[in-house]
Amino acid sequence: MNELFQTPQVEAGIKEYPLMPLRDIVIFPTMVQPLFVGRRFSIRAIEEANKKDKLIFLVLQKDKDVEEPKEEDIYKVGVVAYILRTVPIEDARVKVLVQGLKRGVIKKLEWKEDHYVAQVDVIEERDIPPESQTIEDKALIKAVKESIDKLVSLGKQIIPDLVVLIKELEEPGKLADMVASILDIKSSQAQEILETFDPRERLKKVYKFLQDEIGLLEVKQRISEIARERMEKEQREYYLRQQLKAIQEELGEAGGIKAEIEEYTKKFEEVKECMPEEGVKEVEKNIKRLERLHPESAEAGVIRTWLDWVLDLPWCTRTEDNYDLERAREILDRDHYDLEKVKDRIIEYLAIRKLTQGKEAPTQILAFVGPPGVGKTSLGRSIAEALGRKFVRIALGGIRDEAEIRGHRRTYVGAMPGRIIQAIKQAGTKNPVIMLDEIDKLAISFQGDPAAALLEVLDPEQNKKFTDLYIGIPFDLSEVIFICTGNRADTIPTPLLDRMELIMLSGYSEEEKLFIAKKHLIPKLIPLHGFSPEEIEFTDEAILEIIRGYTREAGVRNLQRQISAVLRKIAVKKLQGEKGPFNITPELVRKLLGVPRYRPEREKKPLVGVATGLAWTEVGGEIMFIEATKMKGKGSLVLTGSLGDIMKESAQAALSYIRSKAEDYGIDPDIFSQVDVHVHVPEGAVPKDGPSAGVAIATALLSLFTDIPVRMDVAMTGEITLRGRVLPVGGLKEKILAAKRAEIYEVILPAKNKDEVMEELPEYVREKMTLHFVDNLEEVFKIALVREPKPLKEA
C-alpha cells in the first residue's frame, strides 16, 4: 500500500508521538482507513501530529463506552500511523484518513495539557522472504489466498483491487496484516492479531479466523437454500419466516415458543385461585390457542399482549391497611393546613375500617371540590400514605372517549385496556387509592360519554365485577378507594355526583396563606434553590406583600411560584458575590418582582349607578362591579358583559322591583317608558352567570334612578325575588375572602346564610369584617346607599 500514498519511513526505536485511543477498530500496518473523530483530546492529538510530521500512535480501548480512557483502559500494542488527510465536518468533529505504518509498544504514557503523548518502542518487523520460507509457510500462504477466493464466491464484499493486492503478497506477515483488515471479527480478536509479532503465528491466527468466517457464510448460504426450497409460491414475508425457522433449527433454538408457553402457564397458576371462573376458562383457552399458532403470526402477537396484561394484573396482591389513627392525623396535619372537615372524614373512614376488620365495610367515594391550588390532589397522596396504600392518579381533563375508561375491544388494531385497569396494573395491588383528577372536565363526543362509563366504576354495587372491554374478565374494584377532584360541582353529571360524598374545599384567607407560606412553602423551597435555612429569612410583611401585590387566587400555587421567583433572583445575587444572610423585606420584594400586578379593586368614592357585587367561580371568589346607565329611549333593558340567562333574568327582576316601588323611592313612574337602561358587568370576555348578583343589580338600578351614590366600601351578594326578598346563595366563604382581598371590610349577605357563614368563616376573618345579614332589599338599600331615598310625595 505504500506505493499508493507517499508516507515517511519510520525507524525502529523509542519515539514520542501524540496518542489517539480508538473505540472499536484496530488499524494494521499498510491499512488505509477513514476515521470520524469527535472527542476533544483525540482532535487535539491530530492537531499536534499535523503540526509536526503527521505521525500519530493509534491504539485500541479495552472498553469502547469509556469516554475518557486512562492508561489502564487502553492496550499497550498499537500502530504508528500517518495522517493522509484531515477534513473538518459538522458538530466540531473531524474526518481523518490514516495509513498504518509500523507496530509499536507503549513504554510511557503522559497527559500533556489536553491530549495524550506516548513514548513508543517502534518494532522493526522481520518478515520471511520467499527464499527463506518452508513448505509449510508456502502452503499456508496458498491456503489463505484460496480462502479469500472462497470468501468472494460466498458473497463477501471485497474491493477487487484489494483482492489483486493480496494475491501479489508473498510474505506471511504482510499478508496476515492485509487479510486481518478485511475480516469481520471482534476488535479484541483483531488486537490479538496485532499483538502477534511472529509473522508465521500471525498468519495462522488469521487463517483460523478466515475459516470461521467462511463457515458462517456457508451456514448462511445453506439456510437460504433450505428456505428457498420450502418457499414455493409464498410471498417474501413467508420466505423470511422460513429463514428464521431454519436459523432456529441450525442453532437449536426451536423450543422458544415452548418456553414462552411454560412462562405463561407458571404465571397463570400463581393467580388462578383469585380469578373468577370465566376468567380461568378464558386464559386457559388462549394459552392453548397460542400453542397451536405460528409464533410470528399476527394473531399470536395479539394473544401474547392480552395474556401479558391479564396475568400481570394484581388478582391476589393487596396491601395491608394501617389503622393507626394518630399516625394518620400526623401525616394529614404535616402535609395540609386547616381542611379539618376533610381530615375528620378520613379519620372516620379509618375508624370504621378498623372496627369492621374481616367484614365488608361500606364503600365511600369521596369528591373534593374547590378552586385550584387548595391541595385537592396532594390530599389524595396523603390519604394513601396514611392508609399505607399505593397511590395512582388518573387525569380525566378533556377525555371524550368512553374507551379511555372502559378499554377498547380486542378486535381493534392497537387495542388497550382503559385507564382504570392501567392504574390497577401500575399500582401493583388490588386495593390502591385511585384519584380521578378533574372529573368535572369530562367531555362528551360521538365516541361516547366517559362520565356514563364511570358510573359502573364508582357504584359500590356494580364495581365488584367491573369488566374492561379489552380484558374481558370481571375485576373486583370494591377494595379500591376512589377519590374524585374538581373545581365545580355543577358541571359533574348528576348520576355521577349521586355516587359521591361531596366535600367542599374553600379558598385560603390571607392569614392562612401567610401560615402556609411560613410553615410549608418556604421551608420546602429554600433547599430546592440551593440555600440553607440560615441564609434566607422572609419577614411576614414581605410574604404579605407577595400575597397582596403579586397573587390573586384562592389557593397557594401562584404564591409558591412568586416565592420561587424571589429565591431565583437571590441565587443570582449570591453567585455574583453578594454575601448572605438575605433578609427578604417588602421593599426587596418590590425590587425583585417589579411593579405589583394587583392593586385593591374597590373604588374609593361613592358612585351613582355602580354597585360592588361578589361572584364565586371555579378559581375562587371575586368582586365584580355592576354598572348601570340610562339614555333616552322606549323603556328597553340592555344587558352586556357576557351574561348568562340566569343573570339576565335577575336583572329583569331587579328592574321590575324598582318599577313596582318607584313612588316609594321618589322615582317618577313615567320615566321608565322614556329611557333605555343599560346594565354592564366589566371583563366582558369572561362568561358570568348565576342569581347571586341580583342584590347588586337592584342597588345599582335604584342608585341610577334616584341619583343617590352607592357606597364603594360595601360589597353584596344574594338572589332577589319580585317581592324584594333576599334569598340564600352559595360560595360565601370565597366571596367574603374576595372582598377582604379587595380591602372591602363590609359585606351584605342573605340572612338565611348566617349559620353557614358563622360556621365556615374563621374567627380571625369575622373579627375584621362587618357582616350585614338581610332579609329584603329595603335593608340592603339602607346600608348600601349613602342616604335613604325619600318617597315621591315627600321628595
Swiss-Prot record:
The lineage of its organism: Bacteria, Pseudomonadati, Aquificota, Aquificia, Aquificales. Residues 17-214 form the Lon N-terminal domain. Induction: By heat shock. Homohexamer. Organized in a ring with a central cavity. Residues 605-787 form the Lon proteolytic domain. It catalyses: Hydrolysis of proteins in presence of ATP. The keyword ATP-binding applies. Belongs to the peptidase S16 family. The keyword NAD does not apply. Its EC number is 3.4.21.53. ATP-dependent serine protease that mediates the selective degradation of mutant and abnormal proteins as well as certain short-lived regulatory proteins. Required for cellular homeostasis and for survival from DNA damage and developmental changes induced by stress. Degrades polypeptides processively to yield small peptide fragments that are 5 to 10 amino acids long. Binds to DNA in a double-stranded, site-specific manner. It is found in: Cytoplasm. This is Lon protease. It comes from Aquifex aeolicus (strain VF5). Keywords: ATP-binding, Cytoplasm, Hydrolase, Nucleotide-binding, Protease, Serine protease, Stress response.
